[in-house]
Amino acid sequence: MSTEQFDPMTFALFLGALSLIPILMIVCTCFLKISMVLLITRNAIGVQQVPPNMALYGIALAATLFVMAPVFNQMQQQFSQAPADMSNMDNLKTSITNGVAPLQKFMTHNTDPDILIHLQENSVKMWPKPMSDDVSKDNLLLVIPAFVLSELQAGFKIGFLIYIPFIVIDLIVSNVLLTLGMQMVTPMTLSLPLKMLLLILINGWTRLLDGLFYSCL
C-alpha cells in the first residue's frame, strides 16, 4: 500500500483505535454482565477464590464469544464488502460506522429505553447547543453508556435472584445449629457443602450459563 492511498494521520488514528479493542470488548458486549453474574454467584456460594478470578474471566470471555459470534460474523461481512477507506477522516468514519452497525443494533436491542432517554435528556443539558441538537438515540456516544448501565442493572438483578436460595440455605443452617445448641459450629462449615450439592443436583452452572446466553439475545 502506497502513501498515496491513505492519509498518514488517519492511519495513525486508526491504529490507535485498535488499542481500544480490549476496552470495547468489555463495554460493548455482554462480557460485563456475564462476568458480574459469575462473580456474584461465587460470592453467594461462599467460596472466595474457587474458581479463581482468571478462570471466571476466561469463562466469561468464552461465553461472550459464543453469544457475540453472529454479531462479529455480520461485522466481518460488512468490512469485507466495504473495507476501511483511510484516504481521509470522513471516509474512515463512514467505513467504521457501517462496519459496527451490527454491534450497534445488538447494543440498542439490549439497552433499557428509559436509560437511553435519560442520557439523551442529559446530553441536551450538558453538551454544547450545536452538538446536542444533532444527537439522536442511534448515536454511539449515547448507545454505549446506556448499554453499559443497562448491563450493570441487569447483572445486579440476576445476581439478586441468585443470592436468594443461598441466603435461605444460610438461614436454615444457622437456625438448625442454634436449635441444636451448636453455636460453636460455624454455619458456613455446613452451608457451603449444601450449596455446592444444590448446584450439582440442579446442574446449576449449565442452567446459569444458558440463562445468561438467552438474556443476551
Curated annotation (Swiss-Prot):
Compartments where found: Cell membrane
Q: Which PROSITE patterns match?
A: FLIP_1 (PS01060), FLIP_2 (PS01061)
Instruction: Identify one Gene Ontology CC term for this UniProt entry.
Output: plasma membrane
Indicate yes or no for the key word Ribosomal protein.
no
Say which domain of life the source belongs to.
Bacteria
What are the GO BP annotations of this UniProt entry? protein secretion; symbiont-mediated perturbation of host programmed cell death
Q: What are the alphabetically sorted keywords of the record?
A: Cell membrane, Hypersensitive response elicitation, Membrane, Transmembrane, Transmembrane helix
> Which sequence ranges are marked TM in the entry?
11-31, 52-72, 158-178, 185-205
Membrane topology is:
Multi-pass membrane protein
Q: Which InterPro entries match?
A: T3SS_IM_P (IPR005838), T3SS_YscR-like (IPR005773)
**Pfam families the record matches:** FliP
Q: Which family does it belong to?
A: Belongs to the FliP/MopC/SpaP family.
Its annotated function is as follows: Required for the secretion of harpin.
NCBIfam families annotated for this entry? PRK12797.1, yscR
Please give the name of this protein: Harpin secretion protein HrcR
- Provide the species name: Pantoea agglomerans pv. gypsophilae
